[in-house]
A protein has these predicted regions:
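Axial heme c-ligation environment in periplasmic c-type cytochrome domains
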Residues: 69, 90-130
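Mobile acidic interaction elements
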Residues: 36-41, 57, 61, 83, ...
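Extracytoplasmic/secreted proteins, especially bacterial periplasmic and envelope-associated proteins
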Residues: 47, 51, 75, 86, ...
Length: 130
């Protein structure tokens, strides 16, 4: 009888423990701002990719005129730590043999900057983005 009592008590305790909620916390859900920010980044990278392919790749895919090649870390690594600002200025205003806006004056400064951000993302994917 004493053994049966402990057996029932053990099963009951195991049942109660298995049914308790424990320390589970729900996974944090994305806020609307997070979703919007991620969607904006993706849209910007797609726009930058298109501009790169339409304009920049004519030199930066082959290294024409000494242009650093997309993805060639060594070619891009000697650049300033102020990547975004310096490269945006070079891409917008022209730099050495690279013409202003890659020779496409119809591009906005923001479009040129999006292409430059795409180049940096593809060359240095581990670097944090603004």
């Amino acid at each position: 009888m004493f053994r049966a009592h402990w057996l029932y008590l053990s099963f009951g305790l195991a049942f109660v423990i298995s049914c308790s909620p424990g320390d589970e916390t729900p996974a944090p859900s994305a806020t609307p701002e997070d979703v919007h920010a991620e969607s904006w980044r993706e849209s910007r990278m797609l726009a930058g990719q298109k501009i790169y392919e339409d304009v920049c790749a004519s030199c930066h895919a082959s290294g024409e005129e000494g242009a650093p090649i997309l993805g060639d870390r060594a070619a891009w690594s000697g650049r300033s730590d102020l990547w975004t600002a310096v490269l945006a200025e070079h891409a917008t205003a022209g730099y050495f043999d690279m013409p202003e806006k890659g020779g496409h004056g119809e591009l906005t400064d923001d479009e040129v900057t999006a292409a430059m951000e795409y180049i940096l993302l593809k060359t240095f994917p581990e670097k944090p983005r603004d």
